[in-house]
A protein has these predicted regions:
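Transmembrane-helix signature of polytopic, membrane-embedded enzymes
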Residues: 7-14, 120, 125-148, 181, ...
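Start-transfer (signal-anchor) and selected internal transmembrane alpha helices
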Residues: 1-20, 120-123, 130-131, 136, ...
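Membrane-interface alpha helices of multi-pass inner-membrane proteins
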Residues: 22, 142, 175, 187-202, ...
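Multi-pass, polyprenyl lipid-linked donor-dependent membrane glycosyltransferases
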Residues: 31, 110-120, 140-148, 152-171, ...
Length: 400
């Protein structure tokens, strides 16, 4: 009787969490994990020096030097000092505090921590779907899609960069959508906080506040908000985002505003590597335009791919029709979205489209499949669930 009263969602996520606890130690060490561990202690000793925790700083310095002496071929953290603060530094702190001295143990702890972040993001993705769609069955299907995509599921136990960014981005979008629903200060602060963490993890996280500002500007153009509300929202978002970024991201402490463009150059550094793709070798900066679409299409289940294509076409059709019907000086039905749900759909559509165009046409350096664009997984599954929702609505309408 008691079990029947427990929400199925609790059982679902408890089972998933227990599964993660059972298998997280089965995964090996990723090619970049040694450097990421080094990077964590690099930032940790900087922070401890600033806070004047001399005893802990001495231990962190010992760890850092031990890593450098064990593998001198690792890249220099002084050069690659523009990411790693959000995941690697807390992981290094845990290793230091709990005195994890065995290599097997501290890498397994990192894997468990990585799984924990993804697990939390899965809960937030479930909540995103729950606030958007009303049919429970497709909400659970969407959550299963999000968790069980083979490539994402496997990497969620060891990929401390790309899956971590996906996780933070998902949490950030949850608060962004809450802001779409209610323009509360709390939603702005939480969105900006997680957007800042996403940005310090991958520079592509910067798109989140930028796209939100564009949506607010569209609201203003369509006369949904007054000029004073427009300026207030813009100011609050910029203030809390920059503040959150500055408080936790030492890389920008040395930022010279007049050299802002050069500050971005480090993020576009790429190694001089060639990869095999369809029988030919290509430089990672000059890949065929089909590289990303091919890797996405062959590594996600075919049913998700089909749902994505159908949903993408339908959303595009709706946006095209709305845009074509916009008339000056006409207020009724003269906008790109007519509800908060449509606004959410448009945000996801624009996000996926923008990054696909960016990756395909602007010679983005990629390797190891599409791992640098794992964050698209959020948008892909959302649109797939959107299609499932339309299918259910169609059959319900037909039945009636």
């Amino acid at each position: 009787m008691l079990i029947s009263k427990i929400k199925f969602s609790y059982i679902f996520f408890i089972c998933y969490f227990l599964l993660g606890l059972l298998i997280y130690s089965d995964y090996g060490i990723g090619i970049e994990e040694h450097f990421q561990r080094q990077n964590g202690f690099y930032w940790l000793k900087k922070i401890l020096t600033f806070l004047r925790f001399d005893d802990l700083n001495f231990l962190a310095l010992e760890k850092y030097n031990a890593i450098r002496s064990y593998d001198p071929s690792l890249p220099d953290s002084e050069f690659f000092n523009f990411y790693g603060i959000a995941f690697d530094t807390p992981a290094a702190f845990l290793e230091l505090i709990f005195k994890f001295n065995e290599s097997k143990l501290y890498f397994e702890v990192r894997h468990l921590l990585n799984f924990f972040y993804f697990f939390i993001s899965a809960i937030f993705f479930y909540l995103i779907l729950k606030r958007r769609f009303k049919y429970k069955i497709i909400i659970y299907f969407g959550s299963i899609f999000y968790i069980t995509n083979p490539r994402i599921f496997g990497d969620s136990f060891h990929n401390n960069k790309d899956v971590f960014f996906l996780s933070i981005l998902t949490i950030c979008i949850f608060f962004l959508f809450k802001y779409f629903e209610k323009k509360k200060l709390k939603n702005i602060v939480l969105f900006c906080f997680f957007a800042a963490i996403a940005t310090s993890s991958r520079i592509m996280g910067l798109y989140l506040p930028i796209l939100l500002l564009i949506f607010i500007f569209i609201d203003y153009l369509s006369k949904k908000i007054l000029i004073k509300d427009f300026l207030k929202q813009i100011s609050l978002i910029l203030f809390f985002f920059i503040l959150s970024l500055y408080l936790h991201y030492p890389y920008i402490w040395k930022l010279n505003f007049f050299e802002f463009i050069s500050w971005f150059k480090a993020f576009f550094y790429h190694m001089n590597l060639r990869i095999l793709f369809f029988g030919d070798y290509y430089h990672i900066k000059y890949l065929p335009r089909l590289y990303l679409p091919t890797w996405i299409s062959i590594t996600i289940p075919i049913y998700i791919l089909m749902l994505l294509i159908i949903g993408y076409i339908l959303i595009f059709k709706r946006i095209f029709q709305r845009t074509a019907n916009i008339r000056p000086h006409v207020q009724t039905y003269n906008d790109l979205w007519r509800s908060t749900n449509e606004k959410k759909d448009l945000f996801i559509f624009v996000s996926l489209t923008s990054f696909m165009i960016f990756a395909i046409f602007l010679n983005t350096a990629m390797l190891s499949g599409w791992r640098h664009f794992y964050f698209l997984h959020n948008f892909i599954i959302y649109i797939a669930v959107y299609t499932l929702n339309l299918i259910i609505l169609y059959f319900k309408k037909k039945k009636n």
